[in-house]
């Protein structure tokens, strides 16, 4: 399973990229708004850091297919690695079909059911993004959805990749890997959590103590 980082914060992206563990970035209107910067400026800066798929979403106020297609084409022009992120709606599927036929990569987002994922894949989506944590929030096991989508895509040999989104903790990441997600897009804080374990910390401190006992500081 591959790791993307889910943020529009350039400093977080630089730190994660320096670890050598991420191979793509996902953003959304909320993450861009949080940075308080121009969309194109932020996205261009990100493409200069990470050499991999960069998801940039159409505006939250864009609701009709024609507008999504127009905006998607502009997003795709920013860089060859751009992926146009489109909401899972009837109009979104129409836009996905057209953009995919034009060779533009698409990421259908806000997926909460296997049927939605299957429709997006049939429309030509490069990626689908089921939201794990948000399903958990309403007492519906999000990991079951990831597993079901993975099974369906495997049965029908669909090329669309699953990006597990709304990942909240390291357990989610392990579960997604076991459930067959191709990618987990993860906040920087969760990536850092994954590097830690109390026994690792204890082992490092023991090595330090043993070294100092023999060689001093």
Swiss-Prot record:
Keywords, A to Z? Answer: Cytoplasm, Pentose shunt, Schiff base, Transferase
Which residues of this protein are catalytic?
85
- What main location does UniProt list? cytoplasm
Q: Which GO terms describe its cellular component?
A: cytoplasm
Which Gene Ontology terms cover its molecular function? aldehyde-lyase activity; transaldolase activity
Q: Which residues form a coiled coil?
A: none
Q: Which reaction does it catalyse?
A: D-sedoheptulose 7-phosphate + D-glyceraldehyde 3-phosphate = D-erythrose 4-phosphate + beta-D-fructose 6-phosphate
Which branch of life, at top level? Bacteria
GO terms under biological process = carbohydrate metabolic process; pentose-phosphate shunt
Q: What class of enzyme is it?
A: transferase
Q: Gene3D superfamilies, per this entry? A: Aldolase class I (3.20.20.70)
Q: Does the keyword ATP-binding apply?
A: no
- Which pathway? Carbohydrate degradation; pentose phosphate pathway; D-glyceraldehyde 3-phosphate and beta-D-fructose 6-phosphate from D-ribose 5-phosphate and D-xylulose 5-phosphate (non-oxidative stage): step 2/3
Q: Where would you find this protein in the cell?
A: Cytoplasm
| EC numbers for this chain | 2.2.1.2
On whether Cytoplasm is a keyword of this UniProt record, the answer is yes
Q: Which family does it belong to?
A: Belongs to the transaldolase family. Type 3B subfamily.
What is its biological role?
A: Transaldolase is important for the balance of metabolites in the pentose-phosphate pathway.
This chain belongs to the protein called: Probable transaldolase
Origin species? Lachnoclostridium phytofermentans (strain ATCC 700394 / DSM 18823 / ISDg) (Clostridium phytofermentans)
Gene encoding it? tal
